[in-house]
Structures are given as structure tokens and as C-alpha cells.
From Swiss-Prot:
Residues 1-45 form a transit peptide. Catalyzes the stereospecific oxidation of squalene to (S)-2,3-epoxysqualene, and is considered to be a rate-limiting enzyme in steroid biosynthesis. Produces primarily oxidosqualene. Keywords: FAD, Flavoprotein, Membrane, Mitochondrion, Oxidoreductase, Transit peptide, Transmembrane, Transmembrane helix. This is Squalene epoxidase 2, mitochondrial. It catalyses: squalene + reduced [NADPH--hemoprotein reductase] + O2 = (S)-2,3-epoxysqualene + oxidized [NADPH--hemoprotein reductase] + H2O + H(+). InterPro entries: FAD/NAD-bd_sf, Squalene_epoxidase, Squalene_monox. Pathway: Terpene metabolism; lanosterol biosynthesis; lanosterol from farnesyl diphosphate: step 2/3. Expressed mainly in inflorescences. Detected in seedlings, leaves, stems, and siliques. It is an enzyme of class 1 (oxidoreductase). Belongs to the squalene monooxygenase family. It is a multi-pass membrane protein. It is found in: Mitochondrion membrane.
Amino acid sequence: MKPFVIRNLPRFQSTLRSSLLYTNHRPSSRFSLSTRRFTTGATYIRRWKATAAQTLKLSAVNSTVMMKPAKIALDQFIASLFTFLLLYILRRSSNKNKKNRGLVVSQNDTVSKNLETEVDSGTDVIIVGAGVAGSALAHTLGKEGRRVHVIERDFSEQDRIVGELLQPGGYLKLIELGLEDCVKKIDAQRVLGYVLFKDGKHTKLAYPLETFDSDVAGRSFHNGRFVQRMREKALTLSNVRLEQGTVTSLLEEHGTIKGVRYRTKEGNEFRSFAPLTIVCDGCFSNLRRSLCKPKVDVPSTFVGLVLENCELPFANHGHVVLGDPSPILMYPISSSEVRCLVDVPGQKLPPIANGEMAKYLKTRVAPQVPTKVREAFITAVEKGNIRTMPNRSMPADPIPTPGALLLGDAFNMRHPLTGGGMTVALADIVVLRDLLRPIRNLNDKEALSKYIESFYTLRKPVASTINTLADALYKVFLASSDEARTEMREACFDYLSLGGVFSSGPVALLSGLNPRPLSLVLHFFAVAIYAVCRLMLPFPSIESFWLGARIISSASSIIFPIIKAEGVRQMFFPRTIPAIYRAPP
């Protein structure tokens, strides 16, 4: 076989030289991206060029046959194509690295450093965001003696249609953090359980609170009022500083997050530094991409209304209507207001502006709500204050980064049907507080990194149980044309109606009072088996066996992907992970 020969070497060398200059003389990026990929590419080109020259020299000695013009053109084409492909790969690799790093700025970046002011306050912890998670965390770490700097985009009272129901398990965490008085003086309502409605029937599900103090129950309220109370609580500590501003990026040095860059409402740029930066900027976080691998799913949208001056059929209970095509949720948020959330599957909504949404609510949804609140529902629709909120689900998939971690909805989300978000956030804060307590000096980078790694494992049993239940229950409650899914939905309602352990067990999981992953899986498949057993009565048939197999398959297809995303080992076997064993430094 003849060696590969490049006859028109000068032109090929010119092409390689121009690509090499392009690679080595690109302007430096303001992001903290290493140029190792470009350097490696340039080295590879030089070696390839040397090999080509050597091949040419050898072939010139051993061959006297001149290539035809078509062969020369082919060599030129191959050389150009190779150069183009190499540059494309390098460029794409660079862009991918930028995307994955998110808004992280290197401390070596000097382009705009002279236009910024450094905040030198001896801060121990920077918290980005002062919502439920950020405010509670600021107060908690402040009580531990940490010097905390909180940066929040807007301190005005927020008006949200979610984050209004705190489960009893979350209230217990609130007590553990010393924040239980934050649900007082905001007209919060006690919640003692749920009532499920389906096809004219209903079943009452009470929280298993017999072993707890009389004050322990769920709480429902205006989210904004609750958050404002926690912010006020944090401000009572002299070592906690709240500042209004927008964090634009994290500051990185040698792979460690050193602080944040932020802009005040006046437009001034500042940099603040601390050994630990905790990002709690909510479900719309623009910083999470540098600290985790976000896989956000939006299965549906909540359409929110406020029903005024009406009473629910069962006082102090959340009401869930298993409607068509999806659930309708109602609960009190004050002594005179009821929040109604209508779930609309998918991401395509009837437009609000042209009245299509109002028509949908009055003709499709109103006939399914309980009779006692139907008139108030229609009145709220006609009033026109209709709001929407996409329902997001995102399993926690962190990128362990020295000096920083994520918390709250910025880190982990689940379908809000079960109201478990605040419970997960508060439980995470308790875990983090206990982990950081032995570390007297947060500047101990090695110890801090190990404890942050432990946090991601220790939070899993509680968080993954609530996450899995929320996402799985939503899929079960959805109306479906599939016969197996329909049977599963019917069986779930009837299973919970049996009472005793069949209702108290699932409700204890939902409320955060007994967040055990194994208990969740057992109850979930107990519902599926209950559905199959009903099909076999009074006499089994081939059709019932086939449908039963489809029910088991459907149940497995619902829960196993969720468990896989949460992490099987961390969820069920956390003690096998070395990261949870950390001795005090």
C-alpha cells in the first residue's frame, strides 16, 4: 500500500498555520475557562503537521510517480475538512464548558475589577436569596454565631400561589429551628388532614398526630406574610446582615467558590467574600447550573384563584378533588380566603387574555368542585384575578464544589401537589446546621468540603421520600384513557378509604412525619396489588390476569424512574456511603 502523500504541502501548511494562529490568539474569555483544551489542540496540530512533513519526505525518496490533478485536489479537500472538523470540535467543547460552568467568574478576571467595590465585612457565610430557605437559614446560622451576609433581589412582600401549605413534619422542623412564632400574627390556619373527593364520594384522611403536642399540625397561610416574618426574625440578630441586590455571578479561584459578585438596586457593582456561599435563589435560579446538573421537568401548570368569604366542606382540612383531567386542590390561607389550585396537564394553557381560561374553568372545572364552594369558585373566575405557576420537578444532582452549595428550590423540586417543598427545605437546614456545628473555622477548606459532601448524602432519606411520593402520587391521580392507570387511580382512592394503617401510613409519609423510603415503596405497591386482587373477584379470568399484569407494570414505570433519579443507594442504603461518617475536625 502506498503511503499517504500530500503533494501541495505549502498550501496545507498555510491552512494549518492560520488555524493554529486562530486557536492560540483568541481573546481570553471573561469566564473562568481553562485554555488547556485549545493548547492541547494546538499541540496535536503541530505533531500532525510534523508527521505529514516526514511522510512527504519519505514518499519523495521512495516514489517518482506524480499525482494526477484530481489526486492533488482530493488531498487539499481532505486537509481542509480535517482542519474544519478540528476547529469545530474545539469551539463546541469550549461552548459546552461555558454552559456547564454557569455564571462563575474567575478571580483572575481583571476586565471589570476596577469598576467594583469589595465588601470586607469578615463574613462567614453568604446566602443568596431570602425566601423561605434563605431566611430560615440566615436565622439558624446566625444563632450558631456565624456572621451571615444575605443578598436578596427584592425585600417587598411577595405574592405567590404556591408555598402556602406547611406540612406537620415541616412545622416540627420549624420548632427545632426556633422559628415557630413565624406562623403567628399572619392569620395562619391549622391544617389537620385532607379530604379526597371522587365521583361524588369523599374520604377523610387525618394526620397521625396522636403522639405529638396539641400545637403540632399543618399550617396554611399567605406565603409572603410567612417569609416577611422570617426575614424580621433574622434581622433581630446583630451578626446577620440583609442587603438588597442581584447576584450576577459566583467568584471562583482555583476551583473554589470565594464569594459573589452582585449589583445593588442603585446599579453599583460589589464583590463579597466568605468561606461558604449558599445559593437559595428559588426555582428560577440563574446560578444553579454551576453547582448541579439541572434536569427540570414541567409536567403541568397550576392555575390559582382566591375564593373569598366561603367555607370549605370540612374545616381545617385540605381538599383534593380527583378531577378530569387532573387534581384540583383547595385549602384555607386566612380566616376569610381559600386558595384554589387547578392543575392543567402539559405546558399549553388556554389563554387568559381572550377569556379562554375563564371559559375552561367555568365549563370544565366548576362542575367538579364541591357544591358548597362552587358559587364562590365561579365568582372568583369572573373577578378575573387568575394566576398561573408552572409545576417543576428536578431531582438533586449536585456538583460538589468547594466553598458553595445549593439549597431549597434552587437545588431540588418536586410536584407541589403534596405541599412538601418547605418541609424538605427546613429539614435540609437542620441537617446542614448540625453538620457545620463542629467546624469552628469555616476557612478550613478540606473539612468544609467533606462536610458539604456529607450533607448531600444525609439529606437523602427525608428529601427523596417526599420527592418520590409527590411525583408518583401526581401521576396516579391523573385521569387517563389507559385502563390500567384508571384502575390504579380507583384503587388508590379505595385503599386510602380503608382507614387504619392503610390511610395513616401514606398520610404520615405525605406529612413528613414518617419519611421512610421503604415504607413509601411498600404502600405504593400495596395499592397496585390491591387493584389486582379486586380484579380477580369473584372469579379470575384471562382478561383480569392480563390487566393485573399491566397494573403492576404501570406502577413500576411510575415509581422506579423517580427512585433511580433520586439515587437508589443514597435513598435506601445511605449507611453504605463513606461520606456520612465525618468525625469533628
